[in-house]
Design a protein with these regions (language model features):
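Helix-turn-helix
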Residues: 2-40, 44
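Amphipathic alpha-helical segments used for helix-helix packing
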Residues: 84-104, 121, 155
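Hydrophobic alpha-helical connector segments
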Residues: 44, 58-88, 142-146
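Conserved hydrophobic residue
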Residues: 12-13, 133, 162
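Amphipathic C-terminal alpha-helical segment
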Residues: 82-86, 122, 126, 136, ...
């Protein structure tokens, strides 16, 4: 939890192992008993952040099996936003430090992200097949746009100003206007 909070606030380059150790209440050298490197700590935080969101979306989609694709889209958006803002330190840190500085993200991080993107690609394909999205739209561009917009809400979302369910409806309307 401490590493996620520090990474959320400082990012990869500004967060040091010394800060993480101090936040946990141990010596820096003791961190190496649990993790081989800073990159391994970051990898764990990023994977947990993506997993929290992935689980939220899976639960939302499981609850809407058999419903119209547009309803499933709204549920997935709501699940993503609820998990994103419900596990803020992990999820925001995972967005902020996905690219580990100059080094490419580890394969485990890329694999988790690809699996999550595939969920959205399938959902977009459902929407296109149902006529809720124009078939001419490039699914990958739409997926990246939508995930970027949802993840970008970490910069401006305030629970006292926006309700997650209402926000999910608004995002859904932007992506797939009613009547399309």
């Amino acid at each position: 939890d401490h590493a996620a909070r520090l990474l959320r606030n400082g990012g990869y380059h500004q967060t040091t192992l010394r800060e993480i150790a101090e936040a946990v209440g141990i010596r820096k050298a003791s961190l190496y008993y649990h993790f081989a490197s800073k990159e391994e700590i970051v990898e764990a935080v990023v994977n947990d952040g993506v997993r929290f969101v992935h689980e939220g979306v899976f639960a939302a989609l499981a609850a809407t099996v058999g419903e119209a694709p547009r309803a499933r889209l709204e549920a997935a958006i709501r699940g993503h936003l609820a998990a994103l803002h419900g596990h803020g330190d992990y999820t925001t840190a995972s967005i902020k430090v996905f690219n580990f500085g100059a080094a490419p993200a580890p394969e485990s991080v890329r694999a988790v992200r690809r699996a999550y993107e595939e969920v959205w690609s399938r959902l977009i394909a459902e929407l296109q097949q149902a006529g809720a999205l124009p078939a001419a739209r490039a699914p990958e561009v739409l997926r990246n746009f939508l995930l970027g917009a949802l993840n970008g809400s970490t910069d401006w979302y305030r629970p006292d100003r926006h309700d997650i369910a209402t926000l999910a409806q608004e995002f859904t309307e932007l992506v797939s206007p009613a009547g399309t």
